[in-house]
Amino acid sequence: MTRKIAIYGKGGIGKSTTTQNTAAAMAYFFGKRIMIHGCDPKADSTRLILGGMMQTTVMDTLREEGEEGVTLDRVRLQGFGEIDCVESGGPEPGVGCAGRGVITAINLMEDLNAYGDELDFVFFDVLGDVVCGGFAMPVREGKAQEIYIVASGEMMALYAANNICRGMVKYAEQSGVRLGGIICNSRRVEGERELIEEFCARLGTRMIMFVPRDNIVQKAEFNRKTVTEFAPDSEQAQVYRELARRIIENDHFVIPTPMTMDEMESLVLKYGLLDLGEAS
């Protein structure tokens, strides 16, 4: 059965990079059949898998050719590791709702049976925080069964992760979606690992992987590749391999217990991310 996973996190935290590198590791090291469905109007969730190519989005095709023009041949491309790639896209700037575009694109892909049983994993790479109903759709309507949140030891990344968990709790009972863990995409913050581990414990989940910061990630991106394709024998490729393995073997799924604002403030104060002047 296809496992459907949504990756959330604060804007700029590295969701797309983490998703693509994890998917590439699953395909290359474990032979898994993967699809990435980008749910961001920037349509950049699959560019490393596709060698830097910006593909035609579902919403662009829908606007230009109508619903009958949206076929898998038009909007689905295959890249590294035979990973299938789809981008939702969004409305023209200043017009319409990008969240509605996510809803429309996912529904169209379901109608076309894009998430078929031949796939082992489908990843939904979702824009930023749970900011509106459209971007919360993978959680709200059970389009994804598993959620992983990309965070770091930075204050705003933790606040965003906590807010995402609050959104999950609202819909978890009706949709069956569960939190699979937190992926720490390290920013080299002092005490970062310990902070994330305590943060996860407060949420009732675990840090599924600590991804160290390594310049080879940027070098691979400059060459329009994932780390696995660019340098499969590198230490960082092995980090993504281990992250892929842990997700494949994960059986620890929970409804999180988000913190109150006072609890969040206490946590970041404990680790020196917020001084008392800022807190007042």
From Swiss-Prot:
Q: Which reaction does it catalyse?
A: N2 + 8 reduced [2Fe-2S]-[ferredoxin] + 16 ATP + 16 H2O = H2 + 8 oxidized [2Fe-2S]-[ferredoxin] + 2 NH4(+) + 16 ADP + 16 phosphate + 6 H(+)
- SUPFAM superfamilies the record matches: P-loop containing nucleoside triphosphate hydrolases (SSF52540)
- Per UniProt, where does ATP bind? 9-16
Q: Which UniProt keywords apply?
A: 4Fe-4S, ADP-ribosylation, ATP-binding, Iron, Iron-sulfur, Metal-binding, Nitrogen fixation, Nucleotide-binding, Oxidoreductase
For activity, the cofactor(s) needed are:
[4Fe-4S] cluster
Give a short account of its post-translational modification.
The reversible ADP-ribosylation of Arg-100 inactivates the nitrogenase reductase and regulates nitrogenase activity.
ADP-ribosylarginine occurs at: 100
GO BP annotation list: nitrogen fixation
Q: How is the cofactor bound?
A: Binds 1 [4Fe-4S] cluster per dimer.
Q: State if 4Fe-4S is listed as a keyword.
A: yes
EC number(s) given by UniProt: 1.18.6.1
| InterPro entries, A to Z | NifH/chlL_CS, NifH/frxC, Nitrogenase_Fe_NifH, P-loop_NTPase
> Which molecular-function annotations from GO does this UniProt entry contain?
4 iron, 4 sulfur cluster binding; ATP binding; metal ion binding; nitrogenase activity
A Pfam family in this protein? Fer4_NifH
Keyword Signal in the entry? The reply is no
Q: Binding of [4Fe-4S] cluster: at which residues?
A: 97, 132
Which protein family is named in the record? Belongs to the NifH/BchL/ChlL family.
Subunit structure, as described in the record:
Homodimer.
Q: What does this protein do?
A: The key enzymatic reactions in nitrogen fixation are catalyzed by the nitrogenase complex, which has 2 components: the iron protein and the molybdenum-iron protein.
Q: Which NCBIfam families match?
A: nifH
- HAMAP family assigned: NifH
State the name under which the record lists this protein. Nitrogenase iron protein
